[in-house]
Design a protein with these regions (language model features):
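Alpha-helical transmembrane helix bundles of large polytopic membrane transport and channel proteins
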Residues: 26-28, 83-198, 212, 519-600
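Signature of alpha-helical transmembrane segments and their immediate interfacial
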Residues: 1-38, 404, 408, 412-461, ...
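Transmembrane alpha-helices and their membrane-interface boundaries in multi-pass membrane transporters
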Residues: 302, 318-331, 355-375, 379-418, ...
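Extracytoplasmic
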Residues: 151-279, 507, 576-671
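Pore- and gate-forming transmembrane helices of large, multi-pass membrane proteins
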Residues: 286, 338-375, 739-769, 789
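Juxtamembrane segments of multi-pass membrane proteins
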Residues: 436-560
Length: 816
């Protein structure tokens, strides 16, 4: 036989030492090690296209450029402010490089190396440029440039090396950089007639390291202060990019954790007092509740990657659910004191009679939460495990501490409890078979409504991935609107253990996309291929050049130069390049230095599995065009992975369909087994399960009425409610084994109402979070708990009346 937890256990010194040690360790972990993570990849499934997005997020999300958007009414002021911001950021410790103009690689000594960086269209124009007519046309334009008033000695020098301006041809068309931002080589990133301008910076360090993200944001704030100090007014300066988004996400999550946890405590306390009607009981319940939450937070601090955006909801849920145990323990203490037991004996009695049902209820709820461990989303797994652990830890803390505090508070015998009048109304409504049938039909009505009306529509499964409240994401939208591009781009990943092979495959994708962009089959793309193609790609392109037999065209170039009035001696280097074209692959000077290093970081990364090269494609979202683009990409690189936040919607819906069934089945099975063991009756276990069916249907109706849509995060809370809300039915059915249903309702009705409302308060606190996914999760949880309470209070007495007769709830022989 299991020995009751409370018989002399708490006064033992070793138990006090353990509690103190665990509390001290949890406090240290909470304040020293607890951190939240801005890594949104924890919200994604780790399979299919979504797995590719997770890999991209972890490899590239840490290196995304910081984009500063400046806007004003006067272009001259915007330009001056941009120059000031760029100057400050170039001296900032958090910034590796700054680019306020599109890169313009210096021409090499051999201008025929232009073929190494030319895509299909540029190669065609290069071939035209080295014909006799093409040479004369380009030389006429070169002569005009040299005669222009702005021409200087530097321009004269490079035009002498490359009088045909061959090296300009790969970049003469607009070059696309991050997120489709276009600019001609050497030009500033401007829009709206110069009233909007971008400054692009390459941050140092990972965006997922809080100190790095904070440093970038602070340095941009210093740049804004420098603009104001220079007397440049009327300029708005805004920041977006990976570091800004990560920092804003972390601040939002910290705010949500603090607000939801505090609000949950306040709302649960108010619900407790309103239903339990004994304010002093809060003094006995809140300290162990805080203690159990602290222990759970200590466990959360051990998560290696920090708390995810969904997992931070554990605190509010644990507080709301944890009060349940306190309600039943303190009620048992009051009952023992009314029976004449001394405060100490009453504390031991309360612990002895409640430890088994409360721990069983906590275990059922904890297992229901832990069933989320079968989910394919890491963030949801963390939420389930933390809530499950918190449910058990708070129950243990309350069993240990609440009776001791209560024995001190209840020195005087409490007065008899005043009867709850609403219980008499409920008994009257379910006291006869006819009324019981009517009550059951009313509770079952939502099942029929859902069958006719249908389940709530599935909303965007990505609702929690891009929090609408984040200012850097709003800035990103403004950049799209001003400079072109659009959200929802595809991310095409070419991977290989060897970096050059991966880059070669990405170059092939870029060549396949170029004609599609010209035909407007896609809105555009940006690739590293134009600025830094792989050595293999460069050699292949130079082979195209060599097929033109440039040495045979040297004399044609010489004649064209002479006819156009150029000095042949000054252009001797260009003539020698035609006679002896370079055969080696070439990297433009500074390509791996400060000028283009951020472009390399945006497109090339490495992880444990090898090199990853990303190409960013903006589809036009026409099914036929998108299908053509996918086919072209996979034809160029059959091993490429096409992903993106919009592209993984199907993957998330698949996860929702699979996990909802799996998690629901596990939770329902465990709850059924627990009910059978606790109630020792098949019929009464079936009654408890019937309350769940009514609850689920009521949730469906409420979501339809309130306009709450299903998505992958709020849908998965529904199976968890099986374990959380079954408590109400279990306590009512357990009490009905020992007495009449009327007495059971009077004894347990107010208590289960208190526990349900405090649980609902915990979920409801999440509605005030700024994170979209948590708000919906909290709304569904709160609605579900209230629906479960109403179902239990009506279905249990009505069903027992029909099954066992009006007065047979106390007949122990009815157990099966």
């Amino acid at each position: 036989m299991v020995r009751p937890l409370g018989r002399g256990a708490w006064p033992r010194a070793w138990l006090r030492v353990v509690v103190v040690a665990v509390t001290v360790a949890s406090t240290w972990l909470t304040f020293d090690r607890l951190r939240v993570s801005g890594d949104l990849s924890t919200l994604l499934p780790e399979s299919g296209d979504a797995a590719a997005l997770v890999r991209w997020t972890r490899a590239f999300g840490v290196r995304e450029p910081a984009i500063v958007l400046l806007r004003g009414d006067r272009p001259a002021d915007v330009e001056a402010a941009a120059d000031r911001v760029a100057a400050v950021l170039r001296g900032a410790a958090s910034i590796a490089s700054v680019m306020d103009r599109a890169p313009a690689p210096d021409p090499p000594s051999d201008p025929t190396l232009a073929w190494a960086f030319a895509g299909p269209e540029a190669r065609a124009r290069l071939a035209e440029a080295v014909t006799a007519e093409g040479m004369r046309a380009r030389l006429r334009d070169t002569r005009a440039l040299l005669l222009a008033p702005a021409a200087g000695s530097e321009a004269e020098a490079w035009l002498a090396r490359d009088p045909l301006r061959l090296f300009q041809i790969p970049w003469e068309a607009r070059a696309e950089l991050a997120a489709g931002v276009p600019a001609a080589a050497g030009a500033a990133f401007t829009a709206d007639g110069g009233r909007a301008r971008l400054v692009i910076a390459e941050p140092r360090g990972s965006a997922f390291v809080s100190s790095n993200a904070e440093a970038v944001v602070e340095d941009v704030e210093r740049a804004k202060a420098a603009v104001a100090a220079a007397g440049i007014s009327g300029i708005t300066i805004e920041l977006t990019g990976g570091h800004a988004i990560a920092w804003a996400t972390e601040q939002m999550m910290r705010r949500d954790l603090e607000v939801s946890g505090t609000l949950s405590l306040v709302l649960a306390s108010l619900a407790f007092v309103a239903t339990f009607r004994r304010v002093r009981a809060l003094v006995a319940v809140l300290p162990p509740l805080v203690l159990g939450t602290l222990w759970t937070t200590g466990l959360a601090a051990l998560l290696p990657s920090g708390l995810s955006a969904v997992a931070i909801g554990f605190a509010a849920v644990v507080v709301g659910v944890g009060v349940d145990t306190g309600v039943h323990v303190y009620a048992a203490l009051l009952e023992a004191r009314r029976a004449g037991l001394s405060p100490g004996d009453a504390a031991r009695r309360a612990r002895a009679v409640t430890w088994q049902p409360t721990l069983m209820a906590a275990a059922v709820a904890a297992v229901a939460f832990a069933s989320l461990a079968f989910c394919g989303l890491k963030a949801v797994r963390e939420l389930g495990l933390l809530c499950g652990a918190g449910e058990l830890l708070t129950a243990i803390a309350i069993l240990l501490v609440t009776p001791e505090i209560g024995s001190w508070l209840e020195r005087a015998a409490p007065p008899p409890p005043s009867p709850a009048r609403w219980v008499d109304v409920l008994v009257s409504l379910t006291g006869t078979r006819a009324r019981a049938w009517i009550a059951l039909l009313v509770c079952a009505a939502p099942i029929a409504v859902v069958a006719v009306w249908g389940w709530p529509r599935a909303g965007s499964a990505l609702v929690a991935l891009r929090p609408r409240a984040l200012e850097p994401l709003a800035v990103q939208e403004r950049v799209y609107a001003l400079f072109g591009g659009q959200p929802g781009q595809w991310i095409v990943l070419s991977t290989d253990p060897d970096e050059d092979r991966a880059r070669t495959r990405a170059d092939a994708i870029a060549e396949a996309l170029e004609p599609l962009a010209r035909a407007r089959t896609i809105d555009g793309y940006d690739s590293l291929s134009t600025f830094l193609p792989s050595e293999e790609t460069q050699r292949a392109r130079l082979a195209v050049r060599d097929a033109l037999d440039l040495p045979s065209r040297r004399s044609t170039l010489e004649s064209a130069l002479r006819e156009s009035g150029f000095d042949l001696d000054a252009c001797a280097g260009a003539l020698d390049a035609f006679a002896h074209p370079s055969a080696r692959a070439f990297a433009p000077p500074g390509a791996l230095g400060t000028t283009l290093s951020w472009l390399t970081a945006r497109h090339v990364a490495k992880d444990a599995r090898g090199a990853i090269v990303a190409t960013y494609v903006r589809p036009v979202r026409t099914p036929s065009d998108d299908a053509r683009v996918r086919a072209a990409i996979l034809a160029a690189d059959p091993g490429a992975a096409i992903t993106g936040f919009e592209a993984i919607d199907a993957a998330l819906r698949a996860v929702l369909g699979r996990d909802l069934v799996l998690v629901g089945a596990v939770a329902l099975l465990l709850v059924t087994l627990a009910m059978r063991l606790v109630l020792r009756s098949v019929r009464r276990a079936f009654v408890a399960l019937a309350t769940l069916a009514c609850e689920v249907a009521a949730v469906g109706v409420a979501m339809n009425v309130l306009g709450i849509h299903w998505h992958v995060y709020d849908a998965l809370v529904l199976p968890v409610l099986f374990g959380v809300t079954i408590d109400e039915s279990m306590f009512l059915l357990h009490a009905a084994r020992e007495t009449t249903m009327r007495a059971a309702l009077h004894a347990q009705g107010p208590l289960v109402t208190a526990t349900a409302l405090t649980t609902a308060a915990g979920f409801f606190a999440l509605v005030f979070c700024r994170f979209d996914g948590l708000r919906d999760l909290g709304a569904v949880g709160a609605v579900g708990v209230v629906a479960g309470l109403v179902s239990a209070l009506v279905v249990v007495p009505a069903a027992l009346c029909i099954i066992e007769g009006a007065d047979k709830g106390s007949d122990k022989r009815t157990s099966v």
